[in-house]
Amino acid sequence: MRVKGGSITRQRRRRWLKLAKGYWGHKSIGFKTAKQAVVKSWTYAFRDRKQRKRDFRKLWISRINAAARNQGISYSQLMHKIKQSNIEINRKMLAEMAIHHQSDFENIVKLAIAKSA
């Protein structure tokens, strides 16, 4: 006896269409294109979770560089002096200090220059 499996097929398709809700055009109503769009979005999500880490690191470096140049030192020289003087602070915190706590950032720059000299 043949089993048609219509309800299971509908459930499976409904699940994919639910994942594609909000997509533009036929990607939200056509099963095949919806499935392709969802799989592609997962690919982008996986890739961009890695990319986000690189983007934030670039942002922190550019912010630290801008603040460091106001103090008369380049980013690379500052990081070298911080490492030489055994100041354990990461780029995220340095960038945060450079924007919101300028006086503390200036103190770290002065300390790094003084200790490494």
Curated annotation (Swiss-Prot):
Pfam families documented for this protein: Ribosomal_L20
Keywords carried by this UniProt record: Ribonucleoprotein, Ribosomal protein, RNA-binding, rRNA-binding
A molecular-function term among this protein's GO annotations: structural constituent of ribosome
PROSITE patterns: RIBOSOMAL_L20 (PS00937)
A Gene Ontology BP annotation from the UniProt entry: ribosomal large subunit assembly
Family membership: Belongs to the bacterial ribosomal protein bL20 family.
PANTHER family referenced in this protein's UniProt entry, alphabetically: 39S RIBOSOMAL PROTEIN L20
Protein name according to UniProt: Large ribosomal subunit protein bL20
Protein source organism: Mesomycoplasma hyopneumoniae (strain J / ATCC 25934 / NCTC 10110) (Mycoplasma hyopneumoniae)
Gene: rplT
